[in-house]
Swiss-Prot record:
A fatty acid binds at residues 107, 127-129. This is Fatty acid-binding protein 12. May play a role in lipid transport. Highly expressed in adult retina and testis with lower levels in cerebral cortex, kidney and epididymis. In the retina, strongly expressed in the ganglion cell layer and throughout the inner nuclear layer in amacrine and bipolar cells. Not expressed in the outer nuclear layer. In the testis, detected in the seminiferous tubules. It comes from Rattus norvegicus (Rat). The gene is FABP12.
Amino acid sequence: MVDQLQGTWKSVSCENFENYMKELGAGRAIRKLGCLARPVVTISTDGDRITIKTKSIFKNKEISFKLGEEFEEITPGGRKSKSTVVLDNDSLVQVQDWDGKEATIRRRLVDGKMVVESAVNNVTCTRTYQRV
């Protein structure tokens, strides 16, 4: 599954991102900038370590991890969270925990595109990426 997600991907559509960011507590200006961003995501592996690099006009971010092992990350919104990534059927699923809250980010292939569903509470955002 991870092999299929390797490569570089450019955001081509985004649904409900502003509401998702609002649910995370992001201010109006950050939410608006986030909606305009068309991030480019590069997923690579080195042995059993997976790296996800995200570049956008808003912020650049990189996480590197092993499946099933907890790691700390600073989210683009500035939250310090503990995250774990696992394979779940056809998806790479990341769970972020911070201050008693939890967000889930599910990455999977659908018709040759990478679909990323991010959820917190009952609010879900869907970003679709096309391979570059």
